[in-house]
Amino acid sequence: MNSWDAGLAGLLVGTMGVSLLSNALVLLCLLHSADIRRQAPALFTLNLTCGNLLCTVVNMPLTLAGVVAQRQPAGDRLCRLAAFLDTFLAANSMLSMAALSIDRWVAVVFPLSYRAKMRLRDAALMVAYTWLHALTFPAAALALSWLGFHQLYASCTLCSRRPDERLRFAVFTGAFHALSFLLSFVVLCCTYLKVLKVARFHCKRIDVITMQTLVLLVDLHPSVRERCLEEQKRRRQRATKKISTFIGTFLVCFAPYVITRLVELFSTVPIGSHWGVLSKCLAYSKAASDPFVYSLLRHQYRKSCKEILNRLLHRRSIHSSGLTGDSHSQNILPVSE
């Protein structure tokens, strides 16, 4: 194993560690907070988090073993199962992000009727469709024997070793990425751009009111006026940064892998194995970044994390004080009469 392979193996280990801890923390927050569970987005987050954890404990270790051993890391049956999960979880992750963007669009564009339009039952139906959509392609690939170990990505994933099936497999792979990656990307762009448009409209209204107030308050201290103007600027940039993060992480993580898969099918130029594994690692890194992008940086999840931490510290302090009291009572000698 050369330095490139060692670096890729280290990247995979780091991604696995961050993904496991962060997604487990999201699950703890969902279990702890009833307020979060009552909201419709909690179902999308739960679906995304469970998929990320499954990918972390099944697919990432097999890819790590493939990088280290430079060969198929498991038997054919286990590899086909891992390839089925890899295809399903990738599509499920993309479609779950599209569902979350639709939820944000409904919340921002229809704030007064959001609870009526996006109930837990509606969210459950969307998750059910996501699963059905994501299961279609790996089920078809399993029936056509297009699941196995792919040396270029050191992973158990979609692959076809028969030259006579090259065209059919290329059409299938193109359709899979069009109806998972491209469809989700279009939904993300349409919904978040609409959200950005509404957010900018509200910012302009707030800015007009703020400027009118500043004009009326002639005796206002210059430092207060400057802070108000700086807050205006931050308000304009906040929505843009969030939406850029949502779409940017989706593209950075998934686009290199999808493009590599398509170039591999339709180009005669050989692709380096290190780039293939790196693009797969980038796709895996979405499982590590999702908890921070969609959950842990939000106020409700931060509050839930603090409550969990305080409860653990409180239990530890009670336990330690109990042990101290027991040891102190044991050290006291009985006084004879």
Swiss-Prot record:
<feature type="topological domain" description="Cytoplasmic">
    <location>
        <begin position="190"/>
        <end position="245"/>
    </location>
</feature>
<feature type="topological domain" description="Extracellular">
    <location>
        <begin position="267"/>
        <end position="276"/>
    </location>
</feature>
<feature type="topological domain" description="Extracellular">
    <location>
        <begin position="145"/>
        <end position="168"/>
    </location>
</feature>
<keyword id="KW-0472">Membrane</keyword>
<dbReference type="Pfam" id="PF00001">
    <property type="entry name" value="7tm_1"/>
</dbReference>
<feature type="topological domain" description="Extracellular">
    <location>
        <begin position="1"/>
        <end position="10"/>
    </location>
</feature>
<comment type="function">
    <text>Orphan receptor. Displays a significant level of constitutive activity. Its effect is mediated by G(s)-alpha protein that stimulate adenylate cyclase, resulting in an elevation of intracellular cAMP.</text>
</comment>
<feature type="transmembrane region" description="Helical; Name=4">
    <location>
        <begin position="124"/>
        <end position="144"/>
    </location>
</feature>
<dbReference type="InterPro" id="IPR049579">
    <property type="entry name" value="GPR26/78-like"/>
</dbReference>
<dbReference type="InterPro" id="IPR051880">
    <property type="entry name" value="GPC_Orphan_Receptors"/>
</dbReference>
<feature type="transmembrane region" description="Helical; Name=7">
    <location>
        <begin position="277"/>
        <end position="297"/>
    </location>
</feature>
<feature type="transmembrane region" description="Helical; Name=1">
    <location>
        <begin position="11"/>
        <end position="31"/>
    </location>
</feature>
<keyword id="KW-0297">G-protein coupled receptor</keyword>
<keyword id="KW-1003">Cell membrane</keyword>
<keyword id="KW-0675">Receptor</keyword>
<dbReference type="GO" id="GO:0007189">
    <property type="term" value="P:adenylate cyclase-activating G protein-coupled receptor signaling pathway"/>
</dbReference>
<feature type="transmembrane region" description="Helical; Name=5">
    <location>
        <begin position="169"/>
        <end position="189"/>
    </location>
</feature>
<keyword id="KW-1133">Transmembrane helix</keyword>
<feature type="topological domain" description="Cytoplasmic">
    <location>
        <begin position="32"/>
        <end position="47"/>
    </location>
</feature>
<dbReference type="GO" id="GO:0005886">
    <property type="term" value="C:plasma membrane"/>
</dbReference>
<comment type="similarity">
    <text>Belongs to the G-protein coupled receptor 1 family.</text>
</comment>
<feature type="transmembrane region" description="Helical; Name=3">
    <location>
        <begin position="82"/>
        <end position="102"/>
    </location>
</feature>
<keyword id="KW-0812">Transmembrane</keyword>
<protein>
    <recommendedName>
        <fullName>G-protein coupled receptor 26</fullName>
    </recommendedName>
</protein>
<feature type="disulfide bond">
    <location>
        <begin position="79"/>
        <end position="156"/>
    </location>
</feature>
<feature type="transmembrane region" description="Helical; Name=6">
    <location>
        <begin position="246"/>
        <end position="266"/>
    </location>
</feature>
<dbReference type="InterPro" id="IPR000276">
    <property type="entry name" value="GPCR_Rhodpsn"/>
</dbReference>
<feature type="transmembrane region" description="Helical; Name=2">
    <location>
        <begin position="48"/>
        <end position="68"/>
    </location>
</feature>
<feature type="topological domain" description="Cytoplasmic">
    <location>
        <begin position="298"/>
        <end position="337"/>
    </location>
</feature>
<dbReference type="GO" id="GO:0004930">
    <property type="term" value="F:G protein-coupled receptor activity"/>
</dbReference>
<feature type="topological domain" description="Cytoplasmic">
    <location>
        <begin position="103"/>
        <end position="123"/>
    </location>
</feature>
<dbReference type="InterPro" id="IPR017452">
    <property type="entry name" value="GPCR_Rhodpsn_7TM"/>
</dbReference>
<keyword id="KW-0807">Transducer</keyword>
<feature type="topological domain" description="Extracellular">
    <location>
        <begin position="69"/>
        <end position="81"/>
    </location>
</feature>
<keyword id="KW-1015">Disulfide bond</keyword>
